[in-house]
């Protein structure tokens, strides 16, 4: 008997097929995407309203009462603002949500996404340092952008430099 491993030609490996009659579940409807987007945007807009009141010099208790949130939420926003310019930066996800909510046109969203200075995920020791390109992948997976839109953005980003892994 020969103990040499057999060379596998991947073309010979059969690809499993779904059971006969099976169809994938339908994606979310535009109405469902809109509802989810509105809920997510409400949180973002509230965070930015809290930031504006902090910049205007309001104290935490007054902001909490005005916004209907716990004082601890205001403190978290204030602490993030001390270490970063904003606690709630604009992201590719937000642009997708704004389009789904009807707050932004298809053209405006795509113009912004085409010119976005993307960063890409990398492995850092035993963790993943996510980049904002992951937001675009998420938007596609959840149905917020079409295959065609994703393909156009991917073609733009294919030539962009990727961050090296740190192992």
Segments from the language model and where they lie:
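Acidic, Ser/Pro/Thr-rich low-complexity regulatory regions
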Residues: 2-167
């Amino acid at each position: 008997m020969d103990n040499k491993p057999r060379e596998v030609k991947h073309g010979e490996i059969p690809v499993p097929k779904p059971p006969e009659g099976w169809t994938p579940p339908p994606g979310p409807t535009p109405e469902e995407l809109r509802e989810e987007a509105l809920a997510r945007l409400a949180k973002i807009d509230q965070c930015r309203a809290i930031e504006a009141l902090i910049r205007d010099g309001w104290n935490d208790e007054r902001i909490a009462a005005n916004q209907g949130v716990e004082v601890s939420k205001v403190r978290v926003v204030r602490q993030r603002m001390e270490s970063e310019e904003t606690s709630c930066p604009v992201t590719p996800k937000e642009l997708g949500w704004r389009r789904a909510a009807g707050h932004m046109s298809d053209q405006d969203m795509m113009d912004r996404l085409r010119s976005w200075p993307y960063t890409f995920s990398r492995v850092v020791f035993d963790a993943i340092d996510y980049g904002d390109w992951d937001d675009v992948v998420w938007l596609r997976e959840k149905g917020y952008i079409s295959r065609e839109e994703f393909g156009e953005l991917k073609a733009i980003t294919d030539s962009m430099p990727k961050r090296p892994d740190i192992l």
